[in-house]
Amino acid sequence: MKKEYFGTDGIRGTVGEPPITPDFMLHLGWAAGRVLARAGQSSVLVGKDTRISGYMLESALESGFAAAGVNVKLLGPMPTPAIAYLTRTLRAAAGVVISASHNPHEDNGIKFFSDDGEKLDDATELAIEAELRQPLKPAPSARLGKASRINDAPGRYIEFCKRSFPYELSLRGLRLVVDCANGATYHVAPAVFHELGAEVIPLADDPDGLNINADCGSLHPKGLQAAVREHDADAGIAFDGDGDRVIMVDHRGEVVDGDGLLYIIARQRMANGGLAGPVVGTVMSNLGLEQGIGRLGLPFLRAKVGDRYVMEMLRREGGILGGESSGHLICLDRTTTGDGIVSALQVLEAMAAQERTLAELADGMDRLPQIMVNVPISRGVPVQDHATVTDAVRDAETRLAGRGRVLLRPSGTEPVLRVMVEGPDQAEVSATAEAIAGAVREAHATLTAPR
């Protein structure tokens, strides 16, 4: 059965427009409470990023859960992976994150974690949607839920992150610029790196409810690149608004994306005595990553885009390490979901253990030029099947002749079609991507023209 509200990463949209409205969130809290809360364990954790709309949505969800007879423990602004960790360690029935990740403040969303700190499976999301179709009926007065706050949540998570870094190593002597995207990591990430010995120069760590991801964070690294050069830093670290993504910048100011970081972590794991199972990327992962992992003697598998699909493939194939180019990195022996801080610490572990710069570590992977063009489209318009587009893709694949890849993929979070092309020649890749993007625009105009 097709889901009506849940996408690849929960429920997301523009604040004030369905489903990101207070009345829907009230109903969602009630529906989720009825599905997720177990007998004898009826508490959920609710955390959020720093968007101003988080207050409104938090209050609505809190009321909905209470109406279902579920107790609510409010965490305040916390990274998404922190909520997954705390859900598991505090033995809650579920964790709820109010965030739209890397999107601007005008957007917001909801994602859930099960009691073991993992994202919900399709069956559970469908069960919540089934409850949403029922009228909201509060529990009897004596069984209504209560709400309370957990004030020591940041400290608990900081200590968890520090424990993921080898005790015998230190970050002393490293100067790090840390871009918190004016998001949920602002009050925890600098503390983690500082307490492990690094000199920390914080960036975008002053959220006002409106500046989350605004020209900062993992999607906008130019400010971080400039700051690394200005401060003569050893590396820069950038998170997205909810802290489940990370990209890094080397001492020269060059970006190392999720593919490069995944390679560095895999190589360090092999140096530490091996890595169980395959490394899992996605269909968008650079071909250079696949080749680099192969040189380490490890199999490389590709999942659909979305960290939940990377997670599913890791579980199915017996792997522990995977990730996306965007910086969602998963290390199942340390976390149950993508964790930007923990992932960055593993890269810093490699730097400290090998006494090499980030640039030297990243140079071990030969990246192929890759271009991605996001073409705005209307949802539900089948542009990929239009002859103009299929012909353009066929022509591109013929020209690349097995030396590269072409991939068209609708975004799961935005109304765009992502056109990805990679190959050995930058100019050829750019021209090919623009040609296909032009074909997509032409097909979309044809399919949406008034009849």
Swiss-Prot record:
Post-translational modification comment from the UniProt entry: Activated by phosphorylation.
Taxonomy, superkingdom: Bacteria
Record flagged with keyword Repeat: no
Note on cofactor: Binds 1 Mg(2+) ion per subunit.
GO cellular component terms attached to this protein's record: cytosol
Phosphoserine sites (modified residues): S101
Signal peptide feature range: none
Disulphides: none
Entry keyword Oxidoreductase: no
Cofactor annotation: Mg(2+)
One GO biological process term: UDP-N-acetylglucosamine biosynthetic process
Active site: S101
HAMAP family: GlmM_B (MF_01554_B)
PANTHER family named among the record's database cross-references: PHOSPHOGLUCOMUTASE (ALPHA-D-GLUCOSE-1,6-BISPHOSPHATE-DEPENDENT) (PTHR42946:SF1), PHOSPHOHEXOSE MUTASE (PTHR42946)
Protein family according to the UniProt entry: Belongs to the phosphohexose mutase family.
Functional note: Catalyzes the conversion of glucosamine-6-phosphate to glucosamine-1-phosphate.
Annotated protein name in UniProt: Phosphoglucosamine mutase
Species for this entry: Alkalilimnicola ehrlichii (strain ATCC BAA-1101 / DSM 17681 / MLHE-1)
Name of the coding gene: glmM
